[in-house]
Amino acid sequence: MKRFLLCSFALVLLYPAGIDMYLVGLPRIAADLNASEAQLHIAFSVYLAGMATAMLFAGKIADQSGRKPVAIVGALVFMMASLLCSRASEGSLFLSGRFLQGVGAGGCYVVAFAILRDTLDEHRRAKVLSLLNGITCIVPVLAPVVGHLIMLRFPWQSLFYTMSAMGIIVGLLSLFILRETRPARLAPRDLSRSSPAAESLVNRFFVSRLAITTLSVSVILTFVNASPVLLMEVMGFSRGDYAITMALTAGVSMVVSFSTPFALGLFKPRTLMLVSQGLFLTAGVTLSLAHTNTVTLFGLTLICAGFSVGFGVAMSQALGPFSLRAGVASSTLGIAQVCGSSLWIWLAAILGISAMNMLIGILIGCSIVSILLIFSVTPNRSVAEHEEIPYQSRP
């Protein structure tokens, strides 16, 4: 079991590392490529577009051909794309490399969740996904620090050499450590109960959890996107204060994420999901009424705690009905989360909604919709029948 957890964690970490590690080198990258920092900030959107593109195909391929081939190819693409970014001499080539990095990271991300669905029951899966969420919260804190240390002695290209090395390590883990977990053919007596056709993506329970996780990701990405404006422009923080504040909020996320597995031993998953949405609602109300920086910071802290306590549980429930189509389900969740959050941020920008109101709106909207879905759509017998661990060791 340890090999699956190690490989899943490594596969997921490519996604946040690809976002956060290069940011510290952005001014030098812009200078060397004769582009403005504003022009290169589109690299974030390009990276997410690459992830979404990969997710369109990676899940189905993983269900048909196996998790291991997709993981190996994804890591290889990430590694080669990182090298392409390091060799870029102008902006368009750099953005092409960023898109391909997203493709590689997206494929690995989908496979990681499919592997966990294949190998863990619902209770253990919720705990592991909460831990995974805590680990991914470490990356936005550590990656810029590592990047800064690298750039003290080496040029910005070294950041992408480092990411390329990460791709190589993940590829080697996938090749030599990871075992195939894709479900084998079912016996004829099981086909009517568990078949790809029976595991529909349009069942009410999956759609409800897809909506909850998409709204939750929209909350956290809106927070990340709006935080520079809120903290430095509205609240008057310096860059140093901003970095410290974001590190502290990431610390809150880590503590809550690592505590959630223990909470799952005491409370039902539904209870933790309601607590999560209650924290979002409280954060929205707090931010709307805040008149001091201290109260605003308290509201922002509630956002991180709310996301960390509920997201892993909701993701685990969303994957539960899919013993044979975990790859497709994981892809669908990933695409909805990336596209849904991007759509909200884009619409809010087009409508001229301020950063604070953008955040308050998604917090209150997410909490109300999610609480209604949690109460109105509960796991039924059909979902329970598919909640099985299909993995069996292969020679």
Swiss-Prot record:
Pfam families named among the record's database cross-references: MFS_1 (PF07690)
Topology within the bilayer: Multi-pass membrane protein
Record flagged with keyword Methyltransferase: no
SUPFAM superfamilies attached to this UniProt entry: MFS general substrate transporter
UniProt keyword annotations, A-Z: Cell inner membrane, Cell membrane, Membrane, Transmembrane, Transmembrane helix, Transport
Subcellular location(s) of the protein: Cell inner membrane
Listed GO CC annotations: plasma membrane
Transmembrane parts of this sequence: 4-24, 42-62, 69-89, 93-113, 131-151, 158-178, 217-237, 247-267, 271-291, 295-315, 328-350, 355-377
Signal peptide bounds: none
Name of the protein in its database record: Multidrug resistance protein MdtL
UniProt organism field: Salmonella paratyphi B (strain ATCC BAA-1250 / SPB7)
